[in-house]
C-alpha cells in the first residue's frame, strides 16, 4: 500500500465528473487500499478518487473505526429528512462550514469483488456518503455550504 497525494481545492480535477468503473482490476483493488491508507493517514472519514487525481467513481468512507465502506460506482437510491451540520474536506484544509444534507440515505454500489450491495446510514454516515458522492460529480462541500465556521 502507498500513501497518495491529496489534491487541493483549485485543482480542476476536483470539478470534473468521474467516469464509472467498467471492470474491477487488481489496479482498482490497489487504489482502494491506497485510498484507505491515505484517508486514515490524513485523519479523514472519507476520500474520493478525484481527491487523489483519479477520475473514476470510487470512494471510501470510515465513520466508525475499522468499518471501511468501499464504494465503486455509488448511487444514492433513497434519502429522507434533513440535517444541518458542520463539514470539512481533506482537499480544503482548515476550512469548515455548515451544510444541509439528507438525514438518512441509502446508497447502492459495488465492492472490490464486483458484488452489488446497499448501505444505509444516518447523521454522520449520511453526510459522509453524500460528501464523497458529490466529489464524484465534481461538487465540493463549499458549493452547498450555508454558513462558514471560523
Residue ranges and their predicted role:
Residues 1-150:
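Positively charged
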Amino acid at each position: 500500500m502507498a500513501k497518495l497525494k491529496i489534491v487541493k481545492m483549485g485543482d480542476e480535477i476536483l470539478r470534473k465528473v468521474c467516469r464509472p468503473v467498467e471492470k474491477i482490476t487488481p489496479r482498482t483493488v490497489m487504489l482502494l487500499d491506497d485510498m484507505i491508507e491515505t484517508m486514515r493517514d490524513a485523519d479523514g472519514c472519507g476520500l474520493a478518487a478525484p481527491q487523489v487525481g483519479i477520475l473514476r467513481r470510487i470512494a471510501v468512507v470510515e465513520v466508525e473505526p475499522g468499518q471501511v465502506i468501499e464504494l465503486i460506482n455509488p448511487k444514492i437510491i433513497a434519502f429522507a429528512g434533513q440535517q444541518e451540520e458542520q463539514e470539512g474536506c481533506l482537499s480544503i484544509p482548515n476550512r469548515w462550514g455548515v451544510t444541509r444534507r439528507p438525514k438518512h440515505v441509502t446508497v447502492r454500489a459495488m465492492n472490490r469483488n464486483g458484488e452489488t450491495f446497499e448501505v444505509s446510514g444516518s447523521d454522520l454516515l449520511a453526510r459522509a456518503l453524500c460528501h464523497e458522492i458529490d466529489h464524484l460529480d465534481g461538487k465540493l462541500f463549499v458549493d452547498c455550504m450555508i454558513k462558514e465556521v471560523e
